[in-house]
Amino acid sequence: MQKPAKIEEAWGRKYPEQVVLAITKAPDGRVNAMAIGWVCIVSDDPPMFLLGIDDPAFTLELIRNNKEFVIAYPSSEMAKETLYFGTVHGHSEDKGAKSGLKFIPAEKVDVPLLADAVANFECRLVTEYRPGNCPLVVGEVIASHVNTDDSVKRLVNCGKGYQLK
């Protein structure tokens, strides 16, 4: 059975949803990361992700300038750090260093991987477009990595107000 509902009520029923970190690198070498819920796989040949990133996010600026980024699926142990990445702006803050998380070199891009993530995907920017008020970024996956510990669980967003578990 269905009933008419305001969009906010209907959107509230989508949880739990995935959350990823879009990792970028500033010109001065700082590691920047942003928590993103608007993400999906849009192609498997070639493999591609689509991200919705609010403008004027520092992450979006870095992706536009560098043409590369990493998508990391944080573990359930990273809720505090993921919340930090999603609520603090990177223009003037060294988010990578202040998070306390470990980053390691990637294979094909000049952006680090999140060492203890469930999975990391090295991406090159394919295109960006704006069908509504939020820019959409498409990145082609050029390398992927998984955690060697299969018991590491993925972090999910369980509701409005950053209910990360």
What do these predicted regions represent?
Residues 1-165:
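Basic, polyanion-binding surface patches
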